[in-house]
Amino acid sequence: MEEIKNITEITQSALAELEAITELKDLEAWRVRYLGKKSLLTGALRNLASLPIEERKAAGAAANEAKAALEAAFLEKEQLSKEKQFASRSEGLDITLPGRPWPIGRIHPLTQVTNEVTAIFSTLGFSVLEGPEIEDDYHNFEALNIPEDHPARENMQTFWIDRPNEDGRLDTLLRTHTSPMQVRYMEKNKPPIRIVVPGKVYRYEATDATHIPMFTQVEGLVVDEGISMAHLKGTLMEFCRRFFGANRKVRFRCDYFPFVEPGVEVAVSCTCGGKKECSVCHGSGWLEILGAGMVHPRVLERVGIDSEKYTGFAFGMGLERLPMLRYGIDDIRLFYSNDTRFLRQF
């Protein structure tokens, strides 16, 4: 029968071509030519409808057998070609070579300093706490003996949240210091107290080499019987010795803070040696790192602690200034610049 003969010839030709193929792209072209919708095999079957029934059945069976044989041969050839291609690629791969390492991040210098500072105070008997960054007026100001007419309440220094209370007053803000956590802790705990509170604080200040609107602060509080300025000075001197080294100069001088009385400012000698062109100390040779003092009796009384029986001291330091002094960094904004050339140095 002529149709069966054509099918046999197409099959033999297809298998011969398949045997000679060496590239996967040629294999796909072969599939389209012999197994596609418009393949040679399909074309050979177009005249089957005009044949007698018996011949039509025989030709159809031959076509199905041919198609099955070609499909099986195609799949086998495809698998062998892929394995050969993979083997040729593997020959150029030295599996004994070490892989390319993934880039590993580093702990941010401010996080490193925060961990170091809290570790130092932990060895001095302090507990480490955290507090909310969104505060209310009472804990951020009133409870810390900051009256309503104090300049710190002005919008120029405080980020108020536009959510008035029942009286129409703005009562919610981004904390300007970590001191509110002192009040919250004393409201629920009685002396003896010895805590430090690290965290972000926010002040509406002009940005320059030593000031930014968001920075990191660590607040400390000690309340117990018989606490004096000697305890305050001894604690802070020991901290400076451990952090900066024994040869660094530390200066205490009087200052005013509403929630302590008396108050002191603590400064550390600048690495520039007092050069006039220094953008950090502006030629003074000193950089203030913290404010401190004896806790004001009114602050203790507000939280129900007897100020006649207990005394205490508090301090708050800007953490960005510590690595600036240690490493001679001349601009506080570098810590928040996301410049990997700077961050990789720590």
UniProtKB/Swiss-Prot annotation:
CDD domains reported for this sequence: PheRS_alpha_core (cd00496)
EC top class, as a word: ligase
Binding positions for Mg(2+) per the UniProt entry: 261
GO BP annotations listed: phenylalanyl-tRNA aminoacylation
Superkingdom: Bacteria
HAMAP family cross-referenced by the UniProt entry: Phe_tRNA_synth_alpha1
Name assigned to this protein: Phenylalanine--tRNA ligase alpha subunit
